[in-house]
C-alpha cells in the first residue's frame, strides 16, 4: 500500500509538472507576436530616442500587471523602477535586468534586419530560417529565435511578464513583493548606475536581489547562479623615452615600457591562474559545501 501511495504521489507530481510545462509552452506561443513586437524596437543605448520607445512599451506592460512605475533620473539615461506590493509585511525581492542592446553590425548577421525576429532551426550547416508556423512543434528542441536582444536581455523580461500574467489570470500571488530595476546602459558599462544606487538607496532597498542576466552553461541547461564575480580596476603607468627612438640606435639600451608592463602583469598570476598579489584571498572562505557545488559543475573545456 505504501509503495502504491508513493507511486501515486510521484505520478501526481509528474503530472502537475507536465501540466505547468504545457501551460508555460502554450502561453509562450500565445505571446510570440508580442515578443516579436518588443524585439522590433531598436535599443541602442547610444540612441536616446530608441531607449525612450522601449521605456514606453515596458511601462505600459508593467502597469497592465498592476505595477507602480516611475523613472529615476541619472547622470546618463534613466533607470526604470517598478513596484508591485502584494502585502507590506512581506519581504521584497528585487530583480535587476537591462533592456538595452549592443549596437548592430549588419555584417555580422545572417538576416536582413536584426530587429525583425526570425525563427531558425539548427542544421549540420548551422542555423537556417524557417516559417514561424513551426514554433508549435513541441518535439523540436533545436528551434531558436534570432534578433538583437532576443536572449540578452529582452528574453528574460518577456518570460518574466508571461509568468506574472499567468499568476494574475489564475488569481495567484507570489509570497513576496516585487521590485524591478531596469537598466538601459548595461552594454555601455552602466555609467549612471553607481551614483544612482547611492542617490536612490531607499527606493532600491530589498531583502533579496536577483539578476536576470548572465551567461548560460554551454550544455544549454537552465542555469542558476548564486553569486557573481566582482571587478576591481586600476591604472598602471610605465615610463620610457620622452619620444619615439630608433631601435637601431637605442634598442635594448632604453627601457621598453611594453616589456616592463608585461612583467608586472605576468607577476600577478601563476600558471594555473591563481592570483599572487599578497592579501588577495585573505577575506575569502569557501565551505566544503560550496566547493562541492563548484566541483559538480560539468566541465566546459571540450566545448570552448
Model feature map: region roles:
Residues 1-19:
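Bacterial Sec-dependent N-terminal signal peptides
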Residues 17-148, 167-176:
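Acidic/His- and Gly-rich active-site-bordering loop/insert found
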Residues 136-140, 235-248:
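The feature captures the short pre-catalytic strand/loop hairpin that immediately precedes
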Residues 217, 226, 247-304:
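Acidic-enriched catalytic cores of C-N bond-cleaving enzymes acting on peptides and small amides
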Amino acid at each position: 500500500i505504501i509503495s502504491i501511495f508513493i507511486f501515486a504521489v510521484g505520478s501526481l507530481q509528474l503530472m502537475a509538472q507536465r501540466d505547468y510545462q504545457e501551460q508555460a509552452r502554450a502561453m509562450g506561443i500565445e505571446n510570440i507576436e508580442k515578443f516579436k513586437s518588443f524585439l522590433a524596437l531598436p535599443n541602442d543605448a547610444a540612441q536616446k530616442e530608441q531607449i525612450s520607445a522601449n521605456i514606453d512599451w515596458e511601462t505600459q506592460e508593467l502597469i497592465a500587471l498592476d505595477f507602480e512605475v516611475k523613472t529615476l533620473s541619472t547622470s546618463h539615461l534613466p533607470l526604470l523602477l517598478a513596484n508591485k506590493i502584494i502585502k507590506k509585511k512581506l519581504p521584497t525581492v528585487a530583480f535587476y535586468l537591462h533592456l538595452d542592446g549592443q549596437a548592430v553590425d549588419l555584417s555580422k548577421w545572417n538576416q536582413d534586419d536584426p530587429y525583425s525576429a526570425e525563427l531558425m532551426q539548427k542544421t549540420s550547416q548551422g542555423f537556417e530560417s524557417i516559417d514561424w508556423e513551426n514554433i508549435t512543434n513541441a518535439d523540436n528542441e533545436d528551434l531558436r529565435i534570432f534578433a538583437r536582444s532576443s536572449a540578452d536581455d529582452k528574453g528574460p523580461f518577456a518570460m518574466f511578464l508571461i509568468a506574472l500574467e499567468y499568476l494574475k489570470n489564475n488569481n495567484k500571488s507570489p509570497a513576496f513583493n516585487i521590485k524591478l530595476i531596469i537598466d538601459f546602459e548595461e552594454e555601455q558599462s552602466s555609467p549612471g548606475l553607481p551614483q544612482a544606487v547611492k542617490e536612490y538607496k531607499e527606493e532600491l532597498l530589498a531583502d533579496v536581489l536577483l539578476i536576470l542576466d548572465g551567461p548560460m552553461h554551454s550544455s544549454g541547461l537552465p542555469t542558476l547562479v548564486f553569486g557573481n564575480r566582482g571587478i576591481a580596476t586600476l591604472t598602471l603607468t610605465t615610463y620610457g623615452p620622452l619620444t619615439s627612438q630608433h631601435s637601431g640606435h637605442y634598442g635594448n639600451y632604453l627601457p621598453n615600457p611594453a616589456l616592463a608592463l608585461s612583467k608586472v602583469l605576468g607577476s600577478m598570476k601563476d600558471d594555473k591562474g591563481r592570483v599572487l598579489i599578497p592579501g588577495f584571498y585573505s577575506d575569502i572562505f569557501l565551505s566544503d559545501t560550496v566547493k562541492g557545488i563548484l566541483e559538480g559543475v560539468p566541465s566546459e573545456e571540450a566545448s570552448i
